[in-house]
Amino acid sequence: MATPAYMSITGTKQGLITAGAFTEDSVGNTYQEGHEDQVMVQGFNHEVIIPRDPQSGQPTGQRVHKPVVITKVFDKASPLLLAALTSGERLTKVEIQWYRTSAAGTQEHYYTTVLEDAIIVDIKDYMHNCQDPGNAHFTHLEDVHFTYRKITWTHEVSGTSGSDDWRSPVAG
């Protein structure tokens, strides 16, 4: 089973949008101590591509960052995220902390993804068919799509990092 990640979101209007999002009142029995001001990320998808000519394989344009898409359960932050979407609120920082099981058998924060100057461009709320027994373990979910100006990836344990900022040209 995959280990979930945890995300915090700070907006220019609402401040810490994820404050209290992972408390018992917000998520019920899935609450875990230590992540109270974050949302649990159940799914993640992100692509960065360089367009290429199908014949030659040569690049035909600049890098393209597609939206970061996370899947999360409905929680205290859900209405605030929808408000950020509908108002076009700029998110100064979106931080996703990735966890894994260490060699010692404990959970360790080993990787971080940070988005700067992000906005929410799409939210899809959904519920799987509750009459289908195969969906018994699903709850109410939402996919949140973020675009951003800058992204930074950091491997916390190994001490490596990389980033891309649309304001800075890529060095050739």
UniProtKB/Swiss-Prot annotation:
Q: Note the coiled coil stretches, chain numbering.
A: none
Q: Name the UniProt key words of this record, in alphabetical order.
A: Secreted
Report the record's disulfide bonds.
Answer: none
Say if the entry is tagged with keyword Secreted.
yes
Question: Record's Gene Ontology CC terms?
Answer: extracellular region
Any idea where this protein resides? Secreted
Q: What name appears for this protein in its UniProt entry?
A: Major exported protein
